[in-house]
């Protein structure tokens, strides 16, 4: 009986720490992704290249995922790394944006499935490009068109609420 109480107390104390570590990892991934999105929105291929390198460094499996979460992460991690690596190796912004499109779709599926984002994430859509991206704010900053006339082209189509 004493052993069960000890195990229960350990689980109560350790589980929140494990969740916090996993959420910190997800926050690192989303923060790096948003840096990449913002670099593309400014039209800087060089900045996007550097931001993709930061994202590549952040792309690692969060600790303590349950079996369903691990399956989701495993389904998408190679795709996320492929697009991120490609963006980090080229400076042509149009080519970067092509890979950013699939990167965004795949990261959305990961975040939606893991339910570990501690900040609200917005999924935005550009009708001109027919492409989606994720944003940290509800304000539209279009990463597919950086010229002033198209910088705010788009609309929010989904919201992933913050998980506390």
Language-model segments: which ranges?
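Intrinsically disordered, low-complexity terminal tails/loops enriched in metal-binding residues
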Residues: 16, 20-164
């Amino acid at each position: 009986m004493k052993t069960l109480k000890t195990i229960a107390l350990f689980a109560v104390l350790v589980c929140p720490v494990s969740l916090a570590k996993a959420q910190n990892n997800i926050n690192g991934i989303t923060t790096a992704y948003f840096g990449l999105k913002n670099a593309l929105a400014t039209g800087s291929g060089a900045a996007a290249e550097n931001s993709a390198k930061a994202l590549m460094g952040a792309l690692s499996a969060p600790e303590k995922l349950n079996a369903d979460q691990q399956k989701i992460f495993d389904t998408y991690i190679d795709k996320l790394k492929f697009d991120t690596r490609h963006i980090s190796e080229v400076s042509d912004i149009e080519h970067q944006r092509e890979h950013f499109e699939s990167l965004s779709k795949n990261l959305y599926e990961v975040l939606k499935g893991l339910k570990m984002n501690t900040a609200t994430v917005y999924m935005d859509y550009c009708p001109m490009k027919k492409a989606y991206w994720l944003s940290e704010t509800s304000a539209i900053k279009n990463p597919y068109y950086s010229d002033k006339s198209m910088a705010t082209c788009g609309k929010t189509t989904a919201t992933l609420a913050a998980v506390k």
